[in-house]
Amino acid sequence: MEEITMALNIENIIAEIKEASILELNDLVKAIEEEFGVTAAAPVAAAADGAADAGAAKDSFDVELTSAGDKKVGVIKVVREITGEGLKEAKAIVDGAPSVIKEGVAAAEAEEIKAKLEEAGASVTLK
């Protein structure tokens, strides 16, 4: 008996909602939000939300030289300084752009490396 009564109540509620105006429905939503402490905001897609969380929690980065720019010699010098490689190896890294210069670098160090390379004229991305 209780199941039948509950079903009738739900059907009545739905029928009332169908006949309500937009303003009445808006007031209903606000009242429900206040009463139950919830929000009617649409949830963000789970995949996008997970990607945002992964990006926020990332604590190590790969520094990638995407382009040497016009000042190639200056960029080679900075790459040598950062990697400790010789002139030939540093030139090969710069000529082979896009290429990863350093992997698994802490966020602060990655930003520092990026700033040095950009100051020398290179384009850099952190991954």
Swiss-Prot record:
Homodimer. Part of the ribosomal stalk of the 50S ribosomal subunit. Forms a multimeric L10(L12)X complex, where L10 forms an elongated spine to which 2 to 4 L12 dimers bind in a sequential fashion. Binds GTP-bound translation factors. Pfam families: Ribosomal_L12, Ribosomal_L12_N. Forms part of the ribosomal stalk which helps the ribosome interact with GTP-bound translation factors. Is thus essential for accurate translation. GO terms for molecular function: mRNA binding; structural constituent of ribosome. This is Large ribosomal subunit protein bL12. Belongs to the bacterial ribosomal protein bL12 family. Keywords: Ribonucleoprotein, Ribosomal protein. SUPFAM superfamilies: ClpS-like, Ribosomal protein L7/12, oligomerisation (N-terminal) domain. GO terms for biological process: translation. GO terms for cellular component: cytosolic large ribosomal subunit.
